[in-house]
Amino acid sequence: MKISNLIPAYLLPFSLFCQVLGAPTNGKRGNVVVVKVKTTVQQTQTDIQTISEATGTTTNYLINTSTETFTRYTATVTSTVYGVPHTYTTVATTPVSAADVIPNSENEVKSSPTESPVEQETSTSSTSVATTTTPVAKNPVSSQETSTPTPVPPETTSTSSSLLSSSQQTTTLAQVSETAINDTTESSGPTITGSVSSQTTDSWIIENISTVTSDGTCFVNYDYYYATETDDAEETTTLTSTITTTVTLN
């Protein structure tokens, strides 16, 4: 038989309250103490990935052009001594006058003498002598009882003499001739657009240089353009990721 059947329903809460009061006050069970400990463990993991790109090298030819202007001042003085003019001059970096000219041999301007035409003499002479000798044969003389002398013509010698003598003299004056050389300038390069400051030093880049020789003339082909600011650097990309994991143990 159950106790709940013996105790009326209105007395059941009172019975439970009495059982709670009769429980021991400490938690000891056979000298064993139960302690609950809560521990939190934090674990951090870091992964680093490095990606290296291909390294490229670019070489630029930079030509810096600067212009510097120099100013020179010249003073000249001409004096006549015994009818012979002498010219003296001086050059300085500051303004000078005729009073600053020192008449000495170092400052004298000497004109170079003009060259006279070169005289070439050519002489040509020819002499020829022709002599011709023609002998005449003697006729034979026959002997007879009655001998009649036959006149014998005298030996005749014909001499022909011809003397030719001529002397020709030719004088030629060599004159100096001046030939003007025509200078031609051809510009086939690219046209540079945009304003360029006169206060700065500009740079140009020259690339793809090649030479070709044709008929004794050397042609140089190259590409050039105005150089602006260029950044030549080796790029390396680094990716870094951090993974954090928190583990809680009860």
UniProtKB/Swiss-Prot annotation:
Q: What happens when the gene is disrupted?
A: Affects yeast-to hyphal transition.
Q: Which UniProt keywords apply?
A: Cell adhesion, Cell membrane, Glycoprotein, GPI-anchor, Lipoprotein, Membrane, Secreted, Signal, Virulence
Q: Where is the composition biased (Low complexity)?
A: 111-173
The Gene Ontology CC terms held by the record are: extracellular region; plasma membrane; side of membrane
Q: Where is this region: Disordered?
A: 99-175
Q: Say which domain of life the source belongs to.
A: Eukaryota
Topology in the lipid bilayer is annotated as: Lipid-anchor; GPI-anchor
Q: What is this protein called?
A: Filamentous growth regulator 41
- Gene name on record? FGR41
